[in-house]
Amino acid sequence: MNTQQLAKLRSIVPEMRRVRHIHFVGIGGAGMGGIAEVLANEGYQISGSDLAPNPVTQQLTSLGATIFFNHRPENVRDASVVVVSSAISADNPEIVAAHEARIPVIRRAEMLAELMRFRHGIAIAGTHGKTTTTAMVSSIYAEAGLDPTFVNGGLVKAAGVHARLGHSRYLIAEADESDASFLHLQPMVAIVTNIEADHMDTYHGDFENLKQTFINFLHNLPFYGRAVMCVDDPVIRELLPRVGRQTTTYGFSEDADVRVEDYQQIGPQGHFTLLRQGMPDLHVTLNAPGRHNALNAAAAVAVATEEGIADDAILRALESFQGTGRRFDFLGEFPLEPVNGKAGTAMLVDDYGHHPTEVDATIKAARAGWPDKNLVMLFQPHRYTRTRDLYDDFANVLTQVDALLMLDVYPAGEAPIPGADSRSLCRTIRNRGKIDPILVSDPAQVATMLAPVLTGNDLILVQGAGNVGKIARYLSEIKLKPQIQEEEQHG
């Protein structure tokens, strides 16, 4: 950003008083790195720490940030403020050092709220679909020439980044309910895609507490703001009378203000009509598969329509939508002859979904777009607590594929819970008699164990929120072919 652009931006958004150097603990996370990227482009000195380099830290380094791949007290020296992710414990040496030096320590959402405070904020919340919906809203606003700032929890593929600093008053951001920190945000518009029981440790196992927290989030809207909510979701329908703000509903339901009708999927694209009250119908081609993505698009269209964005810009943005990283992310189609000697090919798709509802939506999108494919899933459960709390739901959903390989639970810092492990889940699924899951205890054996189940007309879904995305990229790099050293090590 040049000096003239920066001066123009600061005429819209005042800089934080006496803050020059901002340090992020856990800077390699998508949400943390996105905020750091926006602040770096605003001219702040950025530093941060994490355990290992990744594309987020590489991008920040290219912008001039100083990244430490360790956690040491001296890393926070001279920082004006320290921003901490929810994954960082209070006894982290950098947090302890900041407190001792009387440096303010704030959560990620507090810094996001500061970015939003002087802008027209659009916050996207909900259990599922936040990242994709944030990308859709951002794409529509960009297509309309509104040059928004956006901060997303996943890679916006069209932009090649998780976050971007725009020069207008608009800020579009994913709002995270996992630690209730979205209560710091005070947007002008809020989308709520759905509400399900997830991250229940934050809410002390009380679903009513979770629901009330969403209501409290919506009450952060000014009285002239707007809540955009999916009326198909039974919890949202129940909560609507308690919102107390102007609302626009969307969904397949007949009473939705923005209604999805005549949905059909052809390959990776969805085709449908959006009916809007008092507005012309929109005949949409969406470059993203699945009915769940039609709902995400309806939310984005509801916000854009309220803003007065032209229909042709909306339609162009949705038809050219490139998606987000690890959301039904097509990694290639590979011939099987070098893999297992069979004719034909296998498609490889990587997806972040890790809740039964998300996995179910991904499976349905795959079945709808490629009904004749042999559907093979490599699944990595995420967190022992989630596996325990949603055990039966996972067992039911995962029986819908034709072949299932399962990695060990990705713990995300949790201790193992008896009966909530991958071996137990495989046993439960096997006992139901529909499929015979394969437990892959060593990730290095994935290609070797995958090859025999491929038929020559396959769609492979690599599914989960842990490090399974790295395995998906590795499978793409080796074109699914088991490696010689792999066979020597395990054969």
Curated annotation (Swiss-Prot):
SUPFAM superfamilies, per database record: MurCD N-terminal domain (SSF51984), MurD-like peptide ligases, catalytic domain (SSF53623), MurD-like peptide ligases, peptide-binding domain (SSF53244)
Location of this chain's protein in the cell: Cytoplasm
Record keywords: ATP-binding, Cell cycle, Cell division, Cell shape, Cell wall biogenesis/degradation, Cytoplasm, Ligase, Nucleotide-binding, Peptidoglycan synthesis
A UniProt-annotated Pfam family: Mur_ligase
Listed EC numbers: 6.3.2.8
InterPro entries: Mur-like_cat_sf (IPR036565), Mur_ligase_C (IPR004101), Mur_ligase_C_dom_sf (IPR036615), Mur_ligase_cen (IPR013221), Mur_ligase_N (IPR000713), MurCDEF_pg_biosynth (IPR050061), UDP-N-AcMur_Ala_ligase_MurC (IPR005758)
One of the protein's GO biological processes: cell wall organization
Binding-site list for ATP: 126-132
Gene Ontology CC annotation, any one: cytoplasm
Catalytic activity: UDP-N-acetyl-alpha-D-muramate + L-alanine + ATP = UDP-N-acetyl-alpha-D-muramoyl-L-alanine + ADP + phosphate + H(+)
Highest taxon above the source species: Bacteria
GO molecular function: ATP binding; UDP-N-acetylmuramate-L-alanine ligase activity
Pathway: Cell wall biogenesis; peptidoglycan biosynthesis
UniProt xrefs under PANTHER family: UDP-N-ACETYLMURAMATE--L-ALANINE LIGASE, UDP-N-ACETYLMURAMATE--L-ALANINE LIGASE-RELATED
Free-text function comment from the UniProt entry: Cell wall formation.
Family the entry assigns: Belongs to the MurCDEF family.
Name by which UniProt lists this protein: UDP-N-acetylmuramate--L-alanine ligase
